[in-house]
Amino acid sequence: MTFLAVVEGDASGWGIDREALTDAICGRWSGAEVDSLHRSEVRSLIWQFETENGPGEAYLHEDGTCLYMDVWQEDAIWLAIVFRRLTPMDLDLVFCDEGYNFDVRLQAGTTEAELTDLVNAAG
């Protein structure tokens, strides 16, 4: 399933620090492969990795305000928390799945357990 962590509203030119996000992903999944070949607006930077649940992939929108995650929910929650930590506190961030079965605001300081509870309550 695909999940998204996306800035809601105007990001005022802000975009995620790609290097910091790459460092976090490679820190969790040491064998992660990074593909920086710009393939499309949605797939400007791609990370492929092996999780405990199987293969996973994350890719970044070229403006740096949306992270797409093709992973199991627990890995998507971890990635969304990392994305939130790298996002300015004054920007609103939403975490959802591709079918909008749930759509939750991801506040600064939210933990993985709290986000899991929000997702379970919304879904």
List the model feature ranges, each with a label.
Residues 1-31, 122-123:
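Short, extreme N-terminal segment that most often corresponds to the first beta-strand
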Residues 2-6, 46-48, 57-59, 66-68, ...:
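Ordered hydrophobic segments in well-structured contexts
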Residues 8-12, 70-76, 98-100:
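Short, flexible beta-strand-to-coil junctions
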Residues 17, 79-82:
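Hydrophobic side chains in well-ordered alpha-helices
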Residues 18, 76, 112-115:
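Short amphipathic alpha-helical segments that mediate assembly, nucleic-acid/protein binding
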Residues 26-73:
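Short, intrinsically disordered low-complexity segments
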Residues 81-123:
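Acidic, proline/glycine-rich low-complexity IDRs
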